[in-house]
Amino acid sequence: MTWSRRQFLTGVGVLAAVSGTAGRVVAKTLNINGVRYGMVHDESLCIGCTACMDACREVNKVPEGVSRLTIIRSEPQGEFPDVKYRFFRKSCQHCDHAPCVDVCPTGASFRDAASGIVDVNPDLCVGCQYCIAACPYRVRFIHPVTKTADKCDFCRKTNLQAGKLPACV
């Protein structure tokens, strides 16, 4: 394939414009007091063992029947005997503009200014479930013991506070 000088310069111009715009979006997203936590789940390495779910449950004292994160198995891919599955992590995405924070009538759902983590203050939560209805990822739940909203908080009150990584990592 040969490119004319005009096609090349047009392509470079488009690339520069797109790169500049993408950089501004990333910079805006990452600028919460200089810190922004994020979770990357490498689906190519996940075998679906759910050890991450068990570790989360143990460290954060989440009872059986509910979970702060879920590993979802895909439909089978391929034909027997060469069937493969893919595994996906489903947990809080800590949205930039979190609908759960916007709808909370008591301010229990909030974004931590120091880390950017969207969290729930159980002392303020009245269990109205507005945040559960507003969550586009359907990852919040009512904790069966405390009767308050709960979700992934990157182990903010447990492992992160002790200088460790989240339990699921």
Which residue ranges define each predicted feature?
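N-terminal secretory signal peptides and thylakoid transit peptides that target proteins
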Residues: 1-16
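C-terminal segment of N-terminal export signals and the immediately downstream linker at the start
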Residues: 20-52
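Iron-sulfur cluster-binding cysteine motifs and their immediate structural context
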Residues: 23-29, 51-73, 97-124, 130-147, ...
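Short, solvent-exposed loop/turn segments at the edges of secondary structure
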Residues: 34, 87, 145-150
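Short amphipathic alpha-helical segments
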Residues: 35-39, 88, 116
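Mid-chain, structured segments of secreted extracytoplasmic proteins
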Residues: 70-99
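Cys/His-clustered metal-coordination modules, chiefly Zn-binding fingers
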Residues: 153
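Extracellular glycan-interaction patches encoded by glycine-rich segments
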Residues: 157-163
